Amino acid sequence: MKIELLIAEGCPFCREAEQVWRTAVAERQAELRLLDVSHPDGQALTQRLTLNTVPAVLIDGILKGVGVQTLADARQLLNQSRG
């Protein structure tokens, strides 16, 4: 399972989302990839998805949420994405 979190430097919501997703991903012994929208990989992804806001989470390349999820919501998204 590939989990990516699009963030922006200095974004307080992104820091909060990162904490939530780090916890949820660690429980699954998976890895979280952070993509800053100011870097080429992050820019390319935001353009491809036509995103105007961060944080945003992708699981296996599919946009699953924008904004800050609760830990319970993050766990649920991970459970739904298992396959």
Located regions from the model:
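Short amphipathic alpha-helix with an adjacent loop that forms part of the alpha/beta core around
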Residues: 44-48
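Non-catalytic interaction surface on structured domains
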Residues: 18-21, 28-31, 59, 71
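Non-catalytic, surface beta->alpha helical segment in thiol-disulfide oxidoreductase systems
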Residues: 59-83
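Local sequence-structure signature of Cys/Sec-based thiol-disulfide redox active-site neighborhoods
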Residues: 1-26
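Short beta->alpha junction loops/turns
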Residues: 10, 38, 63-64
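Compositionally biased, disordered extreme N-termini, encompassing classical targeting presequences
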Residues: 1-2, 29, 82-83
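Structural micro-motif
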Residues: 49-58
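Thiol-based oxidoreductase modules, predominantly thioredoxin-like and allied folds used
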Residues: 30-42
